[in-house]
């Protein structure tokens, strides 16, 4: 592949660009097929019937070869707008169990949540390939998802 300055861009010149965003949301972990006692045993305080909240941090990584004209894989301003429109506007200051359509009918674990976020974002990423989503539930707990 040729670059604008005559340099050659090789397939091995894969670059990864990550955008970080923050949002707040509430949820509870509760399996309706289990007793209250079983839920409390499995999920502890996360099964609280009055919900609990997190200050989430999301890292969205796109991979690709730099465009020879712009040098970008994806314009990070556009990536931020995509994340806002297709994720943040749907989940920020919401109850994941009750208010978020793509979480309906499933346990609101961070693992299920990151898969749902992937499905919301993937169709809208152009100019690169969605590579990874890292979702921090707390500063010490996060999940990674690669779409596999």
Model features per residue range: what roles?
Residues 1-148:
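Charge-rich, low-complexity N-terminal segments
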């Amino acid at each position: 592949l040729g670059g604008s300055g005559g340099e050659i861009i090789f397939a091995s010149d894969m670059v990864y660009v990550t955008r970080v965003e923050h949002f707040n949301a509430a949820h509870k972990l509760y399996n309706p097929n289990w007793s209250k006692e079983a839920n409390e045993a499995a999920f502890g305080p996360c099964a609280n019937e009055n919900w609990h909240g997190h200050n989430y941090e999301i890292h969205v990584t796109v991979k690709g070869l730099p465009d020879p004209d712009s040098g970008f894989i994806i314009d990070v301003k556009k990536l931020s707008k995509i994340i806002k429109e297709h994720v943040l506007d749907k989940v920020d200051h919401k109850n994941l169990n009750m208010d978020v359509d793509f979480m309906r009918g499933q346990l609101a674990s961070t693992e299920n949540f990151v898969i749902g976020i992937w499905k919301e974002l993937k169709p809208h990423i152009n100019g690169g390939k969605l590579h990874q989503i890292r979702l921090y539930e707390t500063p010490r707990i996060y999940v990674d998802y690669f779409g596999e």
